C-alpha cells in the first residue's frame, strides 16, 4: 500500500484523463467530414468510441501498428453505421483527423483547478501512448504544458503502457523512485496495473 505522505511526484495519463479526447475527436471529425463533403450519420461517434478503445488496447499489446489502428477504427465504424466509403477516403480522413485534432483543446471540467492545486505540492508528469508530435501540440495548445516537469510518450520510451519500460523511462526522466510516485489514468490495465508492475 502506498504511503501518500511519501509521494513527491504524480504521473498522469493525458487522453481521457485530462484531455477530453472524445469531445475533441467529435469536433475534429465534424470538421473533416464537412471539409470532405461527407454526410456521415450522427451516430458515428457513438460507435467510434468503443471501436477506438478496442484498437488502442490491441496497440498497447503490440498486436497492431499505429497505422493499422488509424485505418481500422474508421473502417469498422463506417461498416457498423452502414456508411459506404472507399479505402482511399478512409486514409484521407485518418490523415486529416491527426492533422486537425490539436485545433480543439477541451480538457475535462475542473482539470486546470486540480492541476493548479497540485503543482505547488508535487512534481507533475505525463505518461502517454499517443504520438509524440500530436501529444506535444495537445499540451501546448491547451495550455497544459505549464504544469508538467516531464512528458514521456511511447515513441521516446520505445514501449507503450502497460509495458514496464515506459514507466521506468518516465521515472528515470523524472529522477524519482516508484515508492515516491503515483499514477493517475483512466485505463485500469494500461495505466494502473502497468504502473503497479514496476
List PLM regions with ranges.
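Glycine-rich phosphate-binding loop signature in dinucleotide/nucleotide-binding domains
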Residues: 2-5, 120-122, 173-180
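N-terminal helical cap/lid subdomain that shapes the substrate entry/recognition surface
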Residues: 4-109
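Short acidic capping loops at alpha-helix termini that bridge into adjacent secondary structure
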Residues: 86, 146-150, 177-182
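Substrate-recognition element of Asp-dependent hydrolases with the DxDx(T/V) motif
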Residues: 92-96, 100-106, 111-142, 148-154, ...
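Conserved Lys-Pro-Asp/Glu-containing loop-to-beta segment of HAD-superfamily phosphomonoesterases
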Residues: 160-192
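Structural motif
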Residues: 197-198
Amino acid at each position: 500500500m502506498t504511503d501518500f505522505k511519501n509521494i513527491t511526484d504524480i504521473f498522469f495519463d493525458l487522453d481521457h484523463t485530462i484531455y477530453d479526447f472524445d469531445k475533441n475527436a467529435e469536433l475534429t471529425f465534424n470538421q473533416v467530414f464537412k471539409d470532405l463533403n461527407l454526410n456521415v450519420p450522427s451516430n458515428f461517434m457513438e460507435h467510434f468510441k468503443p471501436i477506438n478503445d478496442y484498437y488502442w488496447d490491441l496497440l498497447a499489446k503490440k498486436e497492431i501498428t499505429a497505422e493499422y489502428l488509424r485505418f481500422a477504427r474508421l473502417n469498422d465504424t463506417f461498416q457498423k453505421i452502414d456508411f459506404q466509403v472507399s479505402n482511399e477516403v478512409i486514409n484521407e480522413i485518418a490523415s486529416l483527423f491527426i492533422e486537425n485534432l490539436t485545433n480543439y483543446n477541451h480538457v475535462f471540467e475542473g482539470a486546470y483547478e486540480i492541476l493548479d492545486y497540485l503543482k505547488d505540492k508535487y512534481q507533475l508528469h505525463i505518461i502517454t501512448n499517443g504520438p509524440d508530435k500530436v501529444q506535444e501540440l495537445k499540451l501546448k495548445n491547451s495550455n497544459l504544458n505549464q504544469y508538467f516537469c516531464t512528458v514521456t510518450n511511447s515513441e521516446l520510451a520505445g514501449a507503450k503502457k502497460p509495458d514496464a519500460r515506459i514507466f521506468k523511462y518516465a521515472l528515470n526522466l523524472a529522477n524519482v523512485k516508484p515508492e515516491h510516485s503515483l499514477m493517475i489514468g483512466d485505463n485500469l490495465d494500461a495505466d494502473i496495473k502497468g504502473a503497479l508492475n514496476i
